[in-house]
């Protein structure tokens, strides 16, 4: 990966996995589509452009694009579920719909983790994030 040329002293560069980079980009894409506040949107677009400027070498683009699209779908679904949870919270409604939504969050996060790992393996990322949770039965 190459670094942007216009780095400032306050910019922090840290090594991350390719999956983490793609996750961050997909979340920023969702934010850029959904955030309406102009000053917030400006910050989101700035960060998104900075991350998109990072070039990934020797990666099978078709596979990465497919996995990234799946990751974006999961992140968008997580966004919607989190919004619905906040709506329940605002109404102090902690019944069955709230419980179902809360359970959906960890299932979606498991899928998100699986996709990030698949991106890491497909891209040959030197850093591979690992998650470890107790398994659950459906």
Where are these regions (language model features)?
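Extended, charge-rich alpha-helical interface modules
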Residues: 2-138
């Amino acid at each position: 990966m190459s670094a942007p040329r216009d780095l400032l002293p306050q910019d922090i560069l840290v090594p991350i996995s390719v999956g983490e980079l793609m996750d961050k980009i997909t979340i920023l894409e969702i934010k850029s589509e959904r955030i309406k506040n102009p000053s917030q949107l400006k910050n989101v677009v700035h960060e998104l452009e900075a991350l998109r400027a990072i070039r990934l070498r020797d990666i099978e683009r078709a596979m990465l694009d497919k996995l990234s699209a799946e990751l974006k779908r999961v992140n968008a679904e997580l966004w919607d579920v989190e919004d619905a949870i906040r709506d329940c919270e605002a109404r102090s409604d902690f019944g069955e719909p709230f419980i179902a939504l809360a359970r959906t969050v960890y299932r979606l996060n498991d899928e998100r983790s699986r996709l990030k790992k698949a991106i890491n393996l497909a891209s040959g990322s030197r850093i591979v994030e690992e998650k470890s949770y107790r398994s659950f039965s459906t």
